[in-house]
Amino acid sequence: MGKQATERRLADTEARAITKMIRTSPYKLNLVAESIRGKTAERALAELTFSKRRMADTVKKTLQSAIANAENNHQLDVDQLIVSEAYVGKAMVLKRWRARARGRVGKILKPFSNLTIVVRERGETA
């Protein structure tokens, strides 16, 4: 029903990396993604290296993949890259049950998330 979602086309100065099915809630993952948005790639990697959050390693791997894509696939200058977009999407939710007292059950939700990081080359501003 409705229109099929189309993926956004990247500009010549952009590169992207996507990680799917990350076993954490989108809220927790977005806290880490939010912290690197708009920063230089070098600064973002440094922040993720020393972050105490569990998802920082996953976000760091995705950012490194985006940087490698920019360098190898798009021939962009790594020193000029900034994190233009870092957004999180909701994936599936595993539903589990836990036996409780008097024959009842408690619902356990195990959410998964998708992460997309887009880096772009910083433009020269005069």
UniProtKB/Swiss-Prot annotation:
What's one GO-annotated cellular component? cytosolic large ribosomal subunit
User: One short Pfam family name for this protein?
Assistant: Ribosomal_L22
GO function term, MF aspect, one: structural constituent of ribosome
Xref: Gene3D superfamilies: Ribosomal protein L22/L17 (3.90.470.10)
Which keywords describe this protein according to UniProt?
A: Ribonucleoprotein, Ribosomal protein, RNA-binding, rRNA-binding
Q: What biological-process terms (Gene Ontology) are attached?
A: translation
What is this protein for, i.e. what is its function? This protein binds specifically to 23S rRNA; its binding is stimulated by other ribosomal proteins, e.g. L4, L17, and L20. It is important during the early stages of 50S assembly. It makes multiple contacts with different domains of the 23S rRNA in the assembled 50S subunit and ribosome. The globular domain of the protein is located near the polypeptide exit tunnel on the outside of the subunit, while an extended beta-hairpin is found that lines the wall of the exit tunnel in the center of the 70S ribosome.
Q: Which family, according to the similarity comment?
A: Belongs to the universal ribosomal protein uL22 family.
Per its UniProt record, what HAMAP family does this chain match? Answer: Ribosomal_uL22_B (MF_01331_B)
Please give the subunit comment from the record. Answer: Part of the 50S ribosomal subunit.
Q: What is this protein called?
A: Large ribosomal subunit protein uL22
Q: Which gene encodes it?
A: rplV
